Amino acid sequence: HLCDRRQRQMCIRDSLYNLEATPAESTSYRLAKHDKERYPDIITASEEGHTPYYTNSSHLPVGYTDDIFTALDVQDELQTLYTSGTVFHAFLGERLPDWKAAANLVRKIAANYKLPYYTLSPIYSVCKNHGYIAGEHFKCPKCGEETEVYSRITGYYRPVKNWNDGKREEYDMRKSYDLNHSKLTHDHTDEVFENCDCTEEKDCL
Protein backbone atom coordinates (compact mmCIF):
# COMPACT_ATOMS: atom_id res chain seq x y z
CA HIS A 1 0.00 0.00 0.00
CA LEU A 2 2.72 2.49 0.99
CA CYS A 3 4.79 1.62 -2.08
CA ASP A 4 1.76 2.24 -4.31
CA ARG A 5 1.00 5.56 -2.62
CA ARG A 6 4.61 6.65 -2.93
CA GLN A 7 4.64 5.83 -6.64
CA ARG A 8 1.32 7.58 -7.22
CA GLN A 9 2.41 10.76 -5.42
CA MET A 10 5.65 10.88 -7.39
CA CYS A 11 3.63 10.83 -10.60
CA ILE A 12 1.08 13.39 -9.38
CA ARG A 13 3.59 15.85 -7.92
CA ASP A 14 6.50 15.17 -10.24
CA SER A 15 8.72 14.82 -7.16
CA LEU A 16 10.81 12.09 -5.62
CA TYR A 17 9.60 10.44 -2.42
CA ASN A 18 11.34 7.96 -0.20
CA LEU A 19 10.02 5.02 1.82
CA GLU A 20 12.53 4.72 4.63
CA ALA A 21 12.96 2.20 7.42
CA THR A 22 13.81 4.64 10.18
CA PRO A 23 15.79 3.58 13.25
CA ALA A 24 14.20 3.95 16.68
CA GLU A 25 16.97 3.77 19.27
CA SER A 26 15.04 5.73 21.90
CA THR A 27 11.48 6.05 20.61
CA SER A 28 10.91 2.29 20.55
CA TYR A 29 11.05 2.44 24.35
CA ARG A 30 9.60 5.91 24.96
CA LEU A 31 6.50 5.38 22.82
CA ALA A 32 5.87 1.91 24.25
CA LYS A 33 6.17 3.27 27.79
CA HIS A 34 3.68 6.09 27.12
CA ASP A 35 1.30 3.74 25.31
CA LYS A 36 1.42 1.28 28.21
CA GLU A 37 0.61 4.04 30.69
CA ARG A 38 -2.34 5.18 28.61
CA TYR A 39 -3.53 1.77 27.38
CA PRO A 40 -2.43 -0.84 29.95
CA ASP A 41 -3.65 -3.78 27.84
CA ILE A 42 -1.71 -2.80 24.73
CA ILE A 43 0.66 -5.43 23.36
CA THR A 44 4.36 -4.57 23.20
CA ALA A 45 7.39 -6.65 22.25
CA SER A 46 8.34 -7.49 25.84
CA GLU A 47 6.75 -10.05 28.11
CA GLU A 48 3.97 -9.12 30.52
CA GLY A 49 5.33 -7.34 33.59
CA HIS A 50 8.64 -6.47 31.93
CA THR A 51 9.90 -3.15 30.59
CA PRO A 52 7.85 -2.34 27.48
CA TYR A 53 9.42 -1.65 24.10
CA TYR A 54 8.57 -1.94 20.43
CA THR A 55 10.64 -3.76 17.85
CA ASN A 56 12.87 -1.46 15.87
CA SER A 57 11.41 -0.28 12.56
CA SER A 58 9.89 -3.41 10.96
CA HIS A 59 12.47 -5.88 12.20
CA LEU A 60 11.55 -9.31 13.50
CA PRO A 61 11.03 -9.77 17.24
CA VAL A 62 14.53 -10.16 18.67
CA GLY A 63 13.78 -13.60 20.08
CA TYR A 64 12.11 -14.91 16.91
CA THR A 65 14.83 -17.36 15.85
CA ASP A 66 18.50 -18.21 16.23
CA ASP A 67 18.67 -19.38 12.59
CA ILE A 68 20.02 -16.50 10.53
CA PHE A 69 18.64 -17.87 7.26
CA THR A 70 15.13 -18.25 8.70
CA ALA A 71 15.29 -14.58 9.68
CA LEU A 72 16.65 -13.59 6.28
CA ASP A 73 13.90 -15.53 4.50
CA VAL A 74 11.29 -13.41 6.29
CA GLN A 75 13.09 -10.08 6.15
CA ASP A 76 14.19 -10.28 2.52
CA GLU A 77 10.67 -9.91 1.16
CA LEU A 78 9.91 -6.96 3.45
CA GLN A 79 13.17 -5.02 3.45
CA THR A 80 13.37 -4.86 -0.33
CA LEU A 81 10.15 -2.79 -0.34
CA TYR A 82 11.97 0.14 1.26
CA THR A 83 13.90 2.62 -0.84
CA SER A 84 16.39 3.54 1.91
CA GLY A 85 17.28 3.17 5.56
CA THR A 86 16.78 -0.57 5.69
CA VAL A 87 19.37 -2.92 7.17
CA PHE A 88 19.53 -6.48 8.48
CA HIS A 89 21.72 -6.92 11.56
CA ALA A 90 23.27 -10.37 11.91
CA PHE A 91 23.63 -10.42 15.69
CA LEU A 92 26.37 -12.90 16.51
CA GLY A 93 27.16 -14.05 20.03
CA GLU A 94 30.89 -13.91 19.34
CA ARG A 95 33.16 -12.94 16.50
CA LEU A 96 33.56 -15.38 13.63
CA PRO A 97 36.67 -17.57 13.77
CA ASP A 98 38.44 -15.86 10.85
CA TRP A 99 37.97 -13.62 7.82
CA LYS A 100 37.11 -16.58 5.60
CA ALA A 101 34.09 -17.45 7.77
CA ALA A 102 32.92 -13.84 7.58
CA ALA A 103 33.49 -13.73 3.81
CA ASN A 104 31.63 -17.01 3.34
CA LEU A 105 28.60 -15.71 5.23
CA VAL A 106 28.57 -12.44 3.28
CA ARG A 107 28.90 -14.41 0.04
CA LYS A 108 25.91 -16.61 0.92
CA ILE A 109 23.73 -13.64 1.84
CA ALA A 110 24.72 -11.74 -1.31
CA ALA A 111 24.02 -14.73 -3.56
CA ASN A 112 20.71 -15.82 -2.07
CA TYR A 113 18.98 -12.65 -0.91
CA LYS A 114 18.09 -9.27 -2.38
CA LEU A 115 18.12 -7.06 0.72
CA PRO A 116 20.51 -4.16 0.15
CA TYR A 117 22.35 -3.76 3.46
CA TYR A 118 23.38 -6.11 6.22
CA THR A 119 25.86 -6.06 9.07
CA LEU A 120 27.82 -8.72 10.92
CA SER A 121 27.41 -7.66 14.54
CA PRO A 122 29.28 -9.72 17.13
CA ILE A 123 29.19 -8.92 20.84
CA TYR A 124 32.50 -8.07 22.48
CA SER A 125 33.70 -6.96 25.89
CA VAL A 126 36.46 -4.61 27.02
CA CYS A 127 38.45 -4.99 30.24
CA LYS A 128 40.40 -1.98 31.48
CA ASN A 129 43.31 -4.30 32.26
CA HIS A 130 43.23 -6.84 29.43
CA GLY A 131 41.48 -5.01 26.60
CA TYR A 132 39.37 -6.76 23.98
CA ILE A 133 37.52 -9.99 24.84
CA ALA A 134 35.38 -11.81 22.27
CA GLY A 135 31.75 -12.34 23.28
CA GLU A 136 29.70 -11.29 26.28
CA HIS A 137 31.69 -11.24 29.53
CA PHE A 138 30.45 -8.87 32.22
CA LYS A 139 33.51 -9.83 34.27
CA CYS A 140 36.98 -10.34 32.84
CA PRO A 141 37.83 -14.08 32.72
CA LYS A 142 41.47 -13.24 33.51
CA CYS A 143 41.28 -10.77 36.41
CA GLY A 144 37.62 -10.74 37.46
CA GLU A 145 37.25 -6.98 36.97
CA GLU A 146 33.97 -5.62 35.67
CA THR A 147 34.05 -5.09 31.90
CA GLU A 148 32.07 -3.06 29.40
CA VAL A 149 30.01 -5.26 27.06
CA TYR A 150 29.47 -3.73 23.62
CA SER A 151 26.71 -4.57 21.17
CA ARG A 152 25.07 -2.82 18.25
CA ILE A 153 22.13 -0.80 19.60
CA THR A 154 20.86 -0.08 16.09
CA GLY A 155 23.32 1.45 13.67
CA TYR A 156 26.27 1.76 16.02
CA TYR A 157 28.00 0.08 18.96
CA ARG A 158 27.55 1.28 22.54
CA PRO A 159 28.18 -0.26 25.97
CA VAL A 160 25.06 -2.22 26.92
CA LYS A 161 25.05 -0.66 30.39
CA ASN A 162 24.43 2.76 28.79
CA TRP A 163 21.35 1.66 26.86
CA ASN A 164 17.90 2.83 27.97
CA ASP A 165 15.67 0.42 29.88
CA GLY A 166 13.72 -0.62 26.80
CA LYS A 167 16.83 -1.42 24.79
CA ARG A 168 18.26 -3.34 27.75
CA GLU A 169 15.08 -5.42 27.84
CA GLU A 170 15.45 -6.00 24.10
CA TYR A 171 19.07 -7.08 24.59
CA ASP A 172 18.08 -9.55 27.32
CA MET A 173 15.43 -11.08 25.04
CA ARG A 174 17.61 -11.17 21.94
CA LYS A 175 18.66 -14.48 20.44
CA SER A 176 22.07 -14.40 18.80
CA TYR A 177 22.26 -16.24 15.49
CA ASP A 178 23.84 -19.68 15.73
CA LEU A 179 25.65 -20.13 12.43
CA ASN A 180 26.58 -23.73 13.21
CA HIS A 181 22.91 -24.72 13.25
CA SER A 182 21.52 -22.26 10.69
CA LYS A 183 20.30 -23.96 7.50
CA LEU A 184 20.10 -22.29 4.10
CA THR A 185 17.39 -24.26 2.28
CA HIS A 186 17.81 -22.60 -1.13
CA ASP A 187 21.56 -22.26 -1.64
CA HIS A 188 22.37 -20.78 -5.06
CA THR A 189 25.81 -19.49 -4.05
CA ASP A 190 27.84 -21.70 -6.41
CA GLU A 191 25.45 -21.01 -9.25
CA VAL A 192 25.65 -17.23 -8.77
CA PHE A 193 29.44 -17.20 -8.53
CA GLU A 194 29.97 -19.85 -11.22
CA ASN A 195 31.09 -17.30 -13.78
CA CYS A 196 33.03 -15.16 -11.33
CA ASP A 197 36.00 -13.46 -13.02
CA CYS A 198 37.94 -12.77 -9.81
CA THR A 199 41.68 -13.11 -10.28
CA GLU A 200 42.28 -14.68 -6.88
CA GLU A 201 40.23 -17.14 -4.83
CA LYS A 202 40.13 -14.79 -1.85
CA ASP A 203 38.42 -12.11 -3.97
CA CYS A 204 35.17 -14.06 -4.13
CA LEU A 205 35.16 -16.08 -0.92
Where are these regions (language model features)?
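Single conserved hydrophobic/aromatic residue that forms the stacking wall/gate
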Residues: 1-12
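Catalytic alpha/beta core of large soluble enzyme barrels
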Residues: 17, 23-126, 150
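Short metal-coordination and nucleic-acid-contact micro-motifs, chiefly zinc-binding Cys/His arrays
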Residues: 120-125, 133-136, 146
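Short cysteine-rich clusters marking metal-coordination/redox-active sites
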Residues: 127, 140-143
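Acidic, low-complexity intrinsically disordered tails
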Residues: 176-205
